[in-house]
Each structure stands twice: as C-alpha cells, then as structure tokens.
Amino acid sequence: LQRMGHDVQHLQPKVEFHPLHPVWKMPFVWSKRLLRKCFGGEWRLPVFEHPHRWIRRYTDVFIYKHIEMRPLSDEEWNASLAKDYDVFMVGSDQVWRPCYALPLERYFLSFLDDTGSNPRIAYAASFGTENCEFSANQILDCRKLLQKFSFVSVREQSGTEICKRIFGVNASHVLDPTLLLSKDDYLKLIQDQSPSKGNLMVYILDETPDTQLF
C-alpha cells in the first residue's frame, strides 16, 4: 500500500494488563468468568504483564520499527475515527476467529456508523478454521456489518464458502499479504542480522503426532 502511494496506519488495541491474583482467590475469579459466559457474556482471558512482555519481547521491536502503529483504548474506537482516514481495511491472520479476535465485532468495523462514506475493505481475512465458530448472535451482528463492506476477500478457499453460506456475501480468494512481498524484501530485513549458530526456530500452530516426532 505504501508503494502505491498511500499513507498507512495500523490501528492497535491498547493492551490492558491485569494484576496477578493470589492463589486463594483464583477459584472465585475463574468461577465468576464462567458464570458470565454461561449467561451470555463475553469470555475474555486476562492478559498479565510479565508473560505478555516476555512473549512479545522480539516481535514488538520489529513491529514498531517497520509498521506505523496507532494504539487505541476501548473508548477511542468510535465513529470519530472516520474523519482521520479515507479507507478502513481489515485482515488477515485469524482476524475473524472469535476466540482470538476480541471484541469480534470490532474486526468487522462496528465502530463506524452509517453516516460516513469511508469504504470498508477486507483483505485476506481469515476465519482460522474450515468451520464457522460464531455464535448465533455473532452471526446476526457480523452479517449486517459485513454486508456494508465495499470489497471482501479471504485467505482460505473455505472462507469464501463461509462468507456466502453464513453471511450472504461474495468473497474473493486471495494471497496472504506476506506473499505479496518479494524475496528481496525479506532479505533486506535480515541483512544486518548475525547468522544463526546452529539454532532452529520451529513454529507449530496445530500439534500432531508427526510434528511431535519432528
């Protein structure tokens, strides 16, 4: 997008860290969350500061060096954002998977109202699985939101079927955005890095007997 002459910002939810509860209090905390879920509330896993920072200690350095970020609190996700941008785009990896994308409706651009004329685009959006994991209420809400999009594309072929069957929207099957870059783009990113000293990083999304043997 930048090479096409566009100014691009990534809207990033501000992470709200939760204090660690004492051990004796944990059964009450989790029971409360379970009851909230049983009565139709949203299941949200708490994010604790120290593990979160440890996990992201390398990725955050890369992200903030190469991507222009705009962190937003929950209150800042509102229709006033429409005046700051010409187009809103959502994508790609598992942005439409309820267990990861919270609150889910935000990833369908629910914070925009119907008064603005900003085009809404989904590029290589992913449901994360071959089956729709949305609840009945989420389907109703997100169907209305998705039908307001100017263009919808998804990363997996199964996603086109979900869009048509569940949401009544025609979606194109496109490449993941990481594959839009050339080999040279990635070589430039690592040109100043020291060669590995025999270490191998393995990223396993779904553990299987074969990957365990590996």
Regions found by a protein language model. Name each.
Residues 71-72, 78-87, 96-100, 124-205:
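A nucleotide-sugar donor-handling region in carbohydrate enzymes
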Residues 206-214:
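Redox- and metal-dependent alpha/beta enzyme cores, enriched for Fe-S-associated oxidoreductases
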Residues 2-144:
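Aromatic- and Gly/Pro-rich donor/ligand-binding loops
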Residues 2-5, 188-191, 214:
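Generic low-polarity alpha-helical segments
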Residues 1-2, 163:
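Hydrophobic alpha-helical packing residues
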Residues 62, 162, 213-214:
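Amphipathic alpha-helical segments that form well-ordered structural scaffolds
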